[in-house]
Amino acid sequence: MKLMDLLEEIDTIEIKGEERINIENIYYDSRKVTPNSLFICIEGFQTDGHHFIDQAIKKGAIAIVAQKDMTGLDGVTWVQVKDTRQVMAQLGSTFYGRPSQHLELIGVTGTNGKTSTTYMIKKILENHERKVGLIGTIANWIGNTEVEAQRTTPESIDLQQIFKEMADEKVTECVMEVSSHALALERVAESEFKVGVFTNLTPEHLDFHENIDNYREAKKKLFYLTTVANVINIDDPHGAMIAEEVKKLKPSLITFGIKKQATVMAKNIATTLKDVTFDLVTPVGEARVTVKIPGIFSAYNALASIATSIAIGVPFDVIVQGIQSIPGVPGRFESVLGIKDFSVIVDYAHTPDAIENVIQAAKNVTEHRVITVFGCGGDRDRTKRSVMGEISGSLSDLSVITSDNPRTEDPYKILMMIEAGIKKTKGLYTIIEDRREAIRYAMKEAKKGDIVLIAGKGHEATQQIGSNVIIFDDCGVAREIAKEEGLDDSDIHS
């Protein structure tokens, strides 16, 4: 595509050089640049793309888009703009032929429940014989083809490329997790959403957003990008605030909840270790529904997916069949099979609200003890560490504090911050830095009927310690320990 065509709708400050050159690709990572490409300088949290212009040119970049004034770029077209992040989204959409226009795009945002909700929506739509794409934390899916996910929401140029691949493969709907970072950093700009979904909002990422109000404002942006409907949990106080504000917009407002009167509701809820059952009440039909993921939080996720499906016209009987056919979501209250006498549950819960929900869900389905193994990630929001410790100390019969992904932080210091919260309670706890040994301790400590809850990493298959990334899968490790310690049931195979 000609550079002049790419720049046609871009608000530029200045252009130096030839505009009639042909651009074969667009990059923001100088290491990936190929000949005849355009390089966009993005100011990141740790690096600044402006520092890698020379490297990009040496690798073949023939045009540079930057926020800073540059000189001495002979033979290279230089384009200065006010905001390269916003422009990257515009360029990506134009370069790939505005692909989101060819998809029914559904965005799901919220602190917790995004992954489960997107998987549920995908399953319902597939039950409606649709070819569905999914973009999220665990993986990206183009129909039945799985593609590794690098982050919850890809950078805008990568996102537009994924949309293009989906459109080329005749995907009809794309369901995607939309993180607050993605909304704040313009990753989903130029993406045309039909439906926006709000699950809930509790303190998280405050190292980035600084306070809960900024966090909510970032999430709220999604509902100004939609054209058909906004689906919002009004039991959540932040959701109620957002719903009140966006109800005046053109897209229809569909609310869901359990406590407050809403468009879509769950009543008479019963939960077991294997599932949650409730009376589904909607404007288009009512039914007794069983979802194979236990917990009240699972009922909320199901309501979000059901309300979304109603918004885009899926028949009620198809919705009910679809939501009940979901086998589960990887790392979301996932039972580790093959263990005798007690249960082991693995969950991604890594926020205060999430860990409270999963511990409470475990307590609701056993009359015995709940032993919680958890930690907190390094180089992330530090304010939640003592809070999570206090929650586990208050609710768990025994807390085993361990490493999550310490990254570049001292693991011991993270553990001490968690311990400070537990000390505010009368809860029993122990500290075992090595995650494998912490899981081993909890499983050896468990008695008949107990639940060992391993929280924080869920589906993740690695652990990051310093600059090292090691293979570590909570489910797999639990199975290995069960076999090593004679805790496995040879008659059950996972």
Swiss-Prot record:
It is an enzyme of class 6 (ligase). Its cofactor is Mg(2+). One of its GO terms (cellular component) is cytoplasm. Pathway: Cell wall biogenesis; peptidoglycan biosynthesis. Its main location: cytoplasm. One of its GO terms (molecular function) is ATP binding. Keywords: ATP-binding, Cell cycle, Cell division, Cell shape, Cell wall biogenesis/degradation, Cytoplasm, Ligase, Magnesium, Nucleotide-binding, Peptidoglycan synthesis. A motif (Meso-diaminopimelate recognition motif) lies at residues 404-407. It is found in: Cytoplasm. Its EC number is 6.3.2.13. It comes from the Bacteria. The modification N6-carboxylysine is found at K219. ATP binds at G110, T111, N112, G113, K114, T115, S116. Carboxylation is probably crucial for Mg(2+) binding and, consequently, for the gamma-phosphate positioning of ATP. One of its GO terms (biological process) is cell division. UDP-N-acetyl-alpha-D-muramoyl-L-alanyl-D-glutamate binds at S30, T152, T153, S179, R187. It catalyses: UDP-N-acetyl-alpha-D-muramoyl-L-alanyl-D-glutamate + meso-2,6-diaminopimelate + ATP = UDP-N-acetyl-alpha-D-muramoyl-L-alanyl-gamma-D-glutamyl-meso-2,6-diaminopimelate + ADP + phosphate + H(+). Belongs to the MurCDEF family. MurE subfamily. NCBIfam families: murE, PRK00139.1-2, PRK00139.1-4. HAMAP family: MurE. Catalyzes the addition of meso-diaminopimelic acid to the nucleotide precursor UDP-N-acetylmuramoyl-L-alanyl-D-glutamate (UMAG) in the biosynthesis of bacterial cell-wall peptidoglycan. This is UDP-N-acetylmuramoyl-L-alanyl-D-glutamate--2,6-diaminopimelate ligase. The lineage of its organism: Bacteria, Bacillati, Bacillota, Clostridia, Peptostreptococcales. The gene is murE.
